[in-house]
From Swiss-Prot:
Its main location: cytoplasm. Coiled coil: none annotated. One of its GO terms (cellular component) is cytosol. The active site is at C82 (proton donor), C227 (proton acceptor). Its EC number is 5.1.1.7. The record marks H169, E218 as: Could be important to modulate the pK values of the two catalytic cysteine residues. GO terms for biological process: lysine biosynthetic process via diaminopimelate. Substrate binds at N20, Q53, N73, G83, N84, N167, N200, E218, R219, G228, S229. This is Diaminopimelate epimerase. It is found in: Cytoplasm. Homodimer.
Length: 284
């Protein structure tokens, strides 16, 4: 049980995947999902528990799935995809006893995901088939997919790749990721009319064909220590350009992820850690 209605206490688990941190709530006992105000309050790092996103464990929605999960950003908005969150939900379900065996399926707000337990605290998650057509991202003003787009933004031209991994991503290749204008350009692209649903913006540096470095400015959150779907997006955009191999290590400020994509209509597979931090109760 996650909540005690009489006392207002909310039970939770704090987790992270490569530094992308989450508050996990089990709603399968009938506890209602958080509204935008409660989600933002819970995610507040000064007055709440503090996290990038809230993950809610729910009853499965598809045949064969062991459970489903919802995603709430730190500003209270709902999200449809979260790769690091998928791994943390998988690990939570294994510890809870809901998920049995080495392979199982979980439902995100976007789709069902196949999960595989690896060594230690590592999990692999099938993240779906990347969508490059502008209408599917969505990216307005362009009729057909291309390797690189250009937009005039406040007097400068920003060049980027674009893809949907169940959520929209723009990928900006840079020479040095440490010096990338993550917050400034990230916020400008998110506010640009070309992205009607806003966009997650990744800044990626190719170290060598098997290794990239990445920083991500996320919708509804800002820059995070890691973004799983952002790592997938950066990898597949670079793979499409022939800049990296089909199996690539992605170094983020909070840790390491590995992204594999055979290409065409195959699913992207992301692997990385899912770490328990602590269990607690929040007096709301």
């Amino acid at each position: 049980m996650s909540a005690d209605g009489r006392s207002g206490r909310l039970r939770f688990t704090k987790m992270h995947g490569a530094g992308n941190d989450f508050v996990v709530l089990d709603l399968r006992d009938g506890t209602p999902p958080p509204d935008a105000a409660l989600a933002a309050q819970l995610a507040d790092r000064h007055f709440g528990v503090g996290c990038d996103q809230i993950l809610t464990i729910e009853a499965p929605r598809s045949e064969g799935a062991v459970a489903a999960y919802g995603i709430w950003n730190s500003d209270g908005s709902a999200a449809r995809q979260c790769g690091n969150g998928a791994r943390c939900v998988a690990a939570w379900l294994v510890r809870d006893g809901t998920a049995q065996g080495e392979r199982f399926i979980i439902d995100s707000p976007m789709s069902a995901h196949a999960v595989e337990r690896l060594d230690g605290d590592r999990y692999a998650v099938a993240m779906g088939v990347p969508q490059f057509e502008p209408a599917q991202i969505p990216l307005a003003g362009f009729a057909h997919a291309r390797d690189e787009y250009a937009l005039p933004v406040h007097g400068e031209t920003v060049r980027f790749g674009a893809v949907s991994m169940g959520n929209p991503h723009a990928v900006v290749e840079v020479g040095r990721v440490d010096a990338a204008p993550v917050e400034r350009v990230g916020a400008l692209l998110q506010q640009n009319a070309a992205f009607p649903d806003s966009v997650n913006v990744g800044f990626v540096q190719v170290v060598d064909p098997a290794h990239v470095r990445l920083r991500v400015f996320e919708r509804g959150v800002g820059e995070t220590l890691a973004c799983g779907s952002g790592a997938c997006a950066a990898a597949v955009v670079l793979m499409q350009r022939g800049r990296v191999e089909r199996d690539v290590q992605v170094s983020l400020p909070g840790g390491e992820l590995r992204i594999r994509w055979p290409g065409d209509q195959e699913q992207v597979v992301m692997s990385g850690p899912a770490v328990f931090v602590f269990d607690g109760e929040w007096n709301r």
